[in-house]
Amino acid sequence: MPGISIHVVDISRGIVARGMRAELWSAAGDGRFARLLEGEIDDRGVLAHPGLDQIFAAGRYRAVFHVGPYYRSEGIASGAHPFLDVVHFDFGISVPEQHVHLPFKCTPWGYSCFRGGA
């Protein structure tokens, strides 16, 4: 099944990051990025957006995770300048027919994102 799936887990508390805002962008030929879609992480920890269930052309993409606002809304991060605020993760698609799964694991102080196997 082609497409992109994004799964977000707040590993500092061992729960999915329900309510975190996430976006997907694509790179244009001039190197600038254009937003394709955005939404919030659901109760399963997934960015459920119909735009993710398509074949994405080969190229450069950017997943954007609003970590700081999420932790502020949860009462965990405070202050005007959290350590992590908005995280950009750039990745490429070489084979459009393959599914790309992006597991994003975060705390208020760090994150991990990689190509998963789901």
Per-region residue spans from a language model:
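Beta-strand-dominated extracellular/periplasmic modules and repeats
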Residues: 2-90, 94, 101-103
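Compositionally biased low-complexity segments at domain edges in trafficked proteins
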Residues: 94-118
